[in-house]
């Protein structure tokens, strides 16, 4: 199979890692991780989460990077070639199955763009000072319960993100080399500021003290596993596209470990900001989206230089949101360019803008956005992720997968790596999918 046009490679190893970290770091790190940590035993949840990050970061993520690089293309082409590895007759079936995880990328992008639009509004209102003088709950309710309330922000987010994809891997790399370092710097600054709040130490103790009884609760294990799995963007789609742009000289397991490490650091630093701040003010750390748009603004209103800290907080969140959207959109764009080679990248990006805004503008209220994200998170994404896991470790020939993983590797990965993937990672992916479908749990 030929490579999709415009599928330029990432120029540097760190450019690839930062782009992958950008995909993985997102809203789930800022409100999802602290929320789940707060509800599932604090330090005990953290220990379980780290265990699964190591597993998925060493097995699942490298597999997706490797398959994309081996196929030389993204989602649709990679599934087709993986299934062809087993039998040429299976190629069409694999290509057809690839549409499901690809649809997951597009559907999650449609909903994700809405919440990033909320963040952009919060950033603008922080800069103007409006957010510092209002009742935060009323402010949030005013636009989150009203149709067509953030259209200008919505258009800016979608069009602005798609413009960063004009040059493919090259422009993705350049933007993430700026956004990701700034994201970490901003959250480190915020963490230092929060450390000075009275009562912050109580939040640190909660975070770092394991409540061992929580280890006996299967729900805690499932929650930590799901958070680790999807926080790393192991969805059977997006990371495959980035893998297609990775040099064959790079070690996919090594870059995957770095991606997992920085994604985990992002989650921990976000928790060091949010959990101690909430404990200091006696506020609920498990407030979901309200945490970002009601709880944190309320805290920022009360501290010196709160307007400045609010502005940099929401700027960091814009970086996290845009870098994640880049991966979702690029996965779809690359596959469409591969499947329909007569299309130009500009035409495809315009098409994505029309679809994203056409579907997303009608769900700008939380009451419509929530069910949409639940639909995607409970059904489409888990099934797509499981299809990917099964395709790599049960359909694709073992020798082909190991050759793909070992390309550029200084250390050979053999039967142990493969068997952990086949008999541990795949069953866990299927378990998460089953829990999502049967118990209607969104990870």
Residue ranges and their predicted role:
Residues 1-32, 60-65, 69-96, 247-251, ...:
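Membrane-interface "cap" regions at the ends of multi-pass membrane proteins
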Residues 2-6, 10, 14, 173, ...:
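Membrane-embedded translocation segments of transport machinery
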Residues 35-49, 68-74, 171-179, 254, ...:
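Transmembrane helix-loop boundary segments of multi-pass membrane transporters
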């Amino acid at each position: 199979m030929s490579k999709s046009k415009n599928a330029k490679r990432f120029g540097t190893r760190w450019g690839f890692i930062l782009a992958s970290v950008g995909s993985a770091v997102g809203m789930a790190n800022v409100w999802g991780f602290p929320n789940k940590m707060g509800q599932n035993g604090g330090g005990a949840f953290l220990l379980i989460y780290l265990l699964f990050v190591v597993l998925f970061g060493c097995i699942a993520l490298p597999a997706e990077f490797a398959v994309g690089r081996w196929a030389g293309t993204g989602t649709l082409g990679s599934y087709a070639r993986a299934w062809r590895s087993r039998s040429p007759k299976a190629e069409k079936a694999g290509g057809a199955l690839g549409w499901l995880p690809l649809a997951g990328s597009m559907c999650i992008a449609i909903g994700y763009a809405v919440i990033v639009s909320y963040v952009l509004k919060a950033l603008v209102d922080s800069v103007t000072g409006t957010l510092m003088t209002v009742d935060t709950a009323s402010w949030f309710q005013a636009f989150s319960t009203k149709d067509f309330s953030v259209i200008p922000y919505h258009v800016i987010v979608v069009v602005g993100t798609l413009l960063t994809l004009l040059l493919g891997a090259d422009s993705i790399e350049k933007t993430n080399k700026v956004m990701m370092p700034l994201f970490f710097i901003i959250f480190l600054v915020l963490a230092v500021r929060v450390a000075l709040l009275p009562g912050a130490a109580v939040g640190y103790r909660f975070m770092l003290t394991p409540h061992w009884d929580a280890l006996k609760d299967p729900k805690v294990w499932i929650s930590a596993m799901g958070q680790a799995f999807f926080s790393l963007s192991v969805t059977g789609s997006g990371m495959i596209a980035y893998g297609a742009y990775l040099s064959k000289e790079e070690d996919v397991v090594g870059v995957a470990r770095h991606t997992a490490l920085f994604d985990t650091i992002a989650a921990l630093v976000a928790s060091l900001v949010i959990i101690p701040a909430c404990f200091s003010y006696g506020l609920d750390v498990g407030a979901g989206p309200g945490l970002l748009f009601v709880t944190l603004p309320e805290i920022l209103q009360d501290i010196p230089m709160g307007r400045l800290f609010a502005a940099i907080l929401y700027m960091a969140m814009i970086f996290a949101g845009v870098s994640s959207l880049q991966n979702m959109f690029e996965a779809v764009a690359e596959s469409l360019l591969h499947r329909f080679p007569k299309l130009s990248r500009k035409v495809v990006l315009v098409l994505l803008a029309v679809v994203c805004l056409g579907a997303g503008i009608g769900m700008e209220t939380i009451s419509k956005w929530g069910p949409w994200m639940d639909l995607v998170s409970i059904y489409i994404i888990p099934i797509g992720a499981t299809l990917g896991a099964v395709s790599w470790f049960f359909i694709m020939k073992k020798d082909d997968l190991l050759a793909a993983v070992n390309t550029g590797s200084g250390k050979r990965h053999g039967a142990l790596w493969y068997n952990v993937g086949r008999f541990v990672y795949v069953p866990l992916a299927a378990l998460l999918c089953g829990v999502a479908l049967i118990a209607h749990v969104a990870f």
